[in-house]
Amino acid sequence: MPLQPELIAQVAYNMRARDRDEMAALGLGLNSSWLAERLALARYGFIACADDGTPIAACAGEEHLPGLVGWSFFATARLPEIGLALTRHLRRITIPTLCEAGVRRAEARSLKGYDWAARWMVSLGFRDLCVLKRFGAGGQDFILWELTDDDVRKSLLQPEATEAA
């Protein structure tokens, strides 16, 4: 589904504790309405829903510069219901579509030590560029992830990752 403030807010209000910690450390606050209004303006993205229509995950790409997108993702505890399908959709459709639209580089950040996020980023084709020491609002370390259009062209030739969220 398209990014809509009410759907983003529903995911944000029910997001996993670890995602909430990460958002707070990034200074994005814990105000679901504010986060929803901000991400609804993202140029790229969607809401992933369960079969019953419940919003489960928000994926948003904000264009920071022409060709450079900052990627945000958070989800509810129901993510395992759609994790594999969501990963496949991102790899097969979303990421190649971003490249076709002229995105040269996507970046994302995750709390250092958030092992699930690290595994998932790798399964999507991202690579860890560096550790951002004391980057978080409370001095937490973050990993900066990158994915370039060259990486995407190479990854399309690789077998698909199968890790479910």
Task: Give the location of each predicted region.
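A short beta-loop-alpha structural element at the N-terminal edge
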Residues: 1-15, 21-22
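Conserved GNAT-fold acetyl-CoA-binding loop/helix
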Residues: 17-35
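A short helix-loop-beta-strand connector motif used in the catalytic cores of GNAT acetyltransferases and
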Residues: 36-47, 57, 102
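Conserved beta-strand in the GNAT
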Residues: 53-63, 68-70
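Conserved acetyl-CoA binding element of GNAT-fold acetyltransferases
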Residues: 67-87
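Conserved acetyl-CoA-binding loop-helix of GNAT-fold acetyltransferases
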Residues: 82-98, 119, 123
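Conserved beta-strand-loop-alpha-helix junction that forms the acyl-donor binding cleft
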Residues: 97, 103-122, 135-136
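Conserved catalytic-core motifs of GNAT/GCN5-like acyltransferases
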Residues: 109, 127-142
